[in-house]
């Protein structure tokens, strides 16, 4: 994930805005609805293929303070089933618009205004609960 964030190509190339077509995404562009019409601020985020390709719900997410150079909201979304090797392979992580990930899992919408430095895990009850969070270290 850190490698993707540090890649000027990903952000500068505006990958966060368009949907790459090389992966078999669960949802196609015409299926996406506008779920965040009043969102203000940067709307880029990271999500794994567990969510966008396999269709698993978000199980864990966190918001870190972005460097401000790109339209990054700071949100990172995972199913919670990924291991370190999976997440560290940038081919399994993509840069997306927050609205896109909300289409995959609308349950995250109430979390999006949380401050930087927060994390949430989905409990056995199916609801998100705040978790302690330590920002990942740089490259």
Give the positions of each predicted feature.
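Acidic, proline/glycine-rich low-complexity IDRs
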Residues: 1-54, 58, 62-139
């Amino acid at each position: 994930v850190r490698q993707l964030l540090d890649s000027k190509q990903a952000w500068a190339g505006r990958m966060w805005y368009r949907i790459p077509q090389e992966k078999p995404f669960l949802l196609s562009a015409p299926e996406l609805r506008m779920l965040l019409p009043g969102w203000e601020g940067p709307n880029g985020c990271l999500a794994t293929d567990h969510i966008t390709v396999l269709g698993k719900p978000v199980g864990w997410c966190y918001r870190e303070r972005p460097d401000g150079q790109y339209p990054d909201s700071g949100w990172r979304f995972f199913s919670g089933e990924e291991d370190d090797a999976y997440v560290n392979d940038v081919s399994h992580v993509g840069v997306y618009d927050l609205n896109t990930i909300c289409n995959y899992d609308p349950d995250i919408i109430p979390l999006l205004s949380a401050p930087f430095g927060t994390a949430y895990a989905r409990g056995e009850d199916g609801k998100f609960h705040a978790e302690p969070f330590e920002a990942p270290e740089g490259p």
